[in-house]
Amino acid sequence: MTDFILNAQARTDLGKGASRRLRHSLSIPAVVYGGDKEAQSLTILAKEITKLFENEAAFSHVIELNVDGVKQNVIIKAMQRHPAKQFIMHADFVRVVAGQKLTAKVPVHFINEEAPVKKGGEISHVESEIEVSCEAKDLPEFIEVDLGNAEIGTIIHLSDLKAPKGVEFVALAHGDDKAVANVHAPRVAPEAEGAAE
């Protein structure tokens, strides 16, 4: 059972024009795919999906998708937002199959950021989410990055993070030890340098 529930209707009217008409009627087009079933086009009320994804945890939890009374467990795979107005324009969901691994992007939470700042450093958040591979039951709500011991010059890579049990960082599994955050000395503006001379 999941805390996140989303209602949808099957959609047969497809194409750009149909999607535009849907958005004008305060609904959005979506698709669900994966598992051993065919992809299915959906219609979801814009206010319902917007409310669901106001909670950051919904991005990294299993969602119960109720399509015309038929329930299935899914995760969000992709979401398209309007570039200027930020409302949701389209969503892709992937069915969750028990015992099978899935990939999902999980938000990064940085803690103890004040420690390097007190030492005169500035923090750059290089990644705001990390792609993980795991079974749905092991999907973490977020990945925690502790900056408490970071100094100026510290670069925190994926390999520096402890993955929760049953969870693998996808990039690291492919040999890409990405930087997640770094601490650097404050940059001095060129005008400030000139004024100091």
UniProtKB/Swiss-Prot annotation:
Summarizing the function annotation, the protein's role is: This is one of the proteins that binds to the 5S RNA in the ribosome where it forms part of the central protuberance.
Listed under GO biological process in this entry are:
translation
Family membership, please give it: Belongs to the bacterial ribosomal protein bL25 family. CTC subfamily.
The UniProt entry, under InterPro entries, shows: Rbsml_bL25/Gln-tRNA_synth_N, Ribosomal_bL25/Gln-tRNA_synth, Ribosomal_bL25_b-dom, Ribosomal_bL25_C, Ribosomal_bL25_long, Ribosomal_bL25_short, Ribosomal_L25_dom, Ribosomal_uL5_bac-type
Organism, by scientific name, is: Pseudomonas putida (strain ATCC 700007 / DSM 6899 / JCM 31910 / BCRC 17059 / LMG 24140 / F1)
Its name, as the record gives it, is Large ribosomal subunit protein bL25
Residues of the signal peptide: none
Which Gene3D superfamilies did the record assign? Ribosomal protein L25, beta domain, Ribosomal Protein L25, Chain P
Gene Ontology molecular function: 5S rRNA binding; structural constituent of ribosome
Q: Which UniProt keywords apply?
A: Ribonucleoprotein, Ribosomal protein, RNA-binding, rRNA-binding
Q: Which residue stretches, if any, does this entry annotate as coiled coil?
A: none
Taxonomy, top ranks, is: Bacteria, Pseudomonadati, Pseudomonadota, Gammaproteobacteria, Pseudomonadales
Subunit composition and interactions:
Part of the 50S ribosomal subunit; part of the 5S rRNA/L5/L18/L25 subcomplex. Contacts the 5S rRNA. Binds to the 5S rRNA independently of L5 and L18.
Instruction: Give GO cellular component annotations, separated by semicolons.
Output: cytosolic large ribosomal subunit
Task: Give the top-rank taxon of the lineage listed in the UniProt record for this protein.
Answer: Bacteria
Cross-referenced HAMAP family, in alphabetical order?
Ribosomal_bL25, Ribosomal_bL25_CTC
